Amino acid sequence: MGLFDKIKKVWSQDMAIDLGTANTLVVVKGQGVVLNEPSVVAIVEQGGKKQVLAVGDEAKTMLGRTPGNIQAIRPLRDGVIADFIVTEEMIKHFIKKVHKGRSFANPRILICVPTGSTPVERKAIQDSALAAGARRVQLIEEPIAAAIGANLPISEATGSMVVDIGGGTSEIAVMSLGGLVYSKSLRVAGDAMDGAMVNYMRKEYNLMIGDSTAEKIKKEIGTAIPTNNNTYAVKGRDLRSGTPKEVNITEEDTAEALNEILRDMVNGIKDALESTPPELSADLVDMGLTLTGGGSLLKNIDKRFSKETGLPVHIADDPLSCVAIGTGKALENTPPELSADLVDMGLTMTGGGSLLKNIDKRFSKETGLPVNIADDPLSCVAIGTGKALDDQEIFSTVLSEY
C-alpha cells in the first residue's frame, strides 16, 4: 500500500456498526462489511474488576463451557446495553481489530438502535462508543437502516414495510417519504426462539439443552410450517437420571416449539397494518413486506407470515447484513464534521517527506483539497514541541489530551 493510500485510509476510518444482541457487524466507509462477530465477551473478575479475556468468535466458543472464575456473557439484551463496561470493552476491541490496533484510530461512528429504545438506553449506547474511542457518535433507527440495506424505496411517496428479526428484538416499521409512518419494537426474536426450544425440549422430552444447542436445532431443522418428516438428533442431559441422553426430533416439534413466538410476530405485523393510513395500505398490498435479520432465515417463515397477513412476503437478498449495509449507506451520505473548513483551509504537510517534488500537487489532485507545505517542514515538530514547553496553556492542553 502506497503512502497516499495509507493517508486516505486513515482519513476514511469512519464506521457504521450494527450493534446486535447476537452479532455485531462493522462497515468501514468505502470498504463494506469488514467484521461480523458474535456480541459475546469472556471476562474474569480479579480484585473486584472485570478483565476481558476474549471477544467475539473466540468468546462465543466459551459460552456454557467456562470454569467458575470465567464468564462468557452477552453485554446487550433485547437490543440495548445490559452491561455498560463490558459493552465499552467490546466496541473498543472491534474498533482496534478493524483498524489493526492503531492507537490513533478515533472514528466517527454511526450505530443503529431499536425504535423502542428509550432516551436513556440510546445515551448509554452513545456514551459506550465514545468511551471506546469514537470521536463522534450518531444513531440511526434499525428498521430505517434495514430498509436502506434491502434497497426499499423509502424516500418515495409509496409505502414500504420491513420486519427485521434480530437476536433480541423484531423491528416492524412502515415507511414513506424517508420517514417512519409506524414503528414498533417487539422483544421477541431469535433469542426468544432459542429459549422456546429449550423449554419445549425440557417439557416434552425431559431433556436439558443449552442455548447453543437450541440455536443449532433452529438452524438445522427449525421451521415455521412443517413440510417433511426430517429428524434431527439432539443431545443433552436427562432431567430424571442426570445422565447424557440423545433424542430424535422432527420438524413438527420445532414448529410447535416456535408457534407462540411466531404468533406474537404475526400479531405485531397485523397491529402495524391496522395503524397504517389507507393510502399506504394499498401500496403494501402490491409491495408486500420485506424480512431482514437472522430470524428471517427460519424455514418457511415467509410462507407463514404471508398466509396469516394476506400480503406478499419477501426475504431480502442478504438478510444477515441488511442493517449493517444500510447503516453504512447512511454513513456515506452523512457529511463529516469540519469538512467545510477543510475545503477552505486544506491540509498542511510537514516532515522531510513533504519536500518530495510535486507531492503537494499529487495529494491535492487526488483529495480535492488545497495542500500547503509548511515554511520549515523539517523543523516543525521540534519547533512545536518547544512552543508547547514555553506556552503553559498549550502545554496544559497537550497534557489533558493524554
Protein language model annotation of sequence segments:
Residues 1-165, 173-290, 296-402:
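Nucleotide/phosphate-binding catalytic cleft detector across ATP-hydrolyzing
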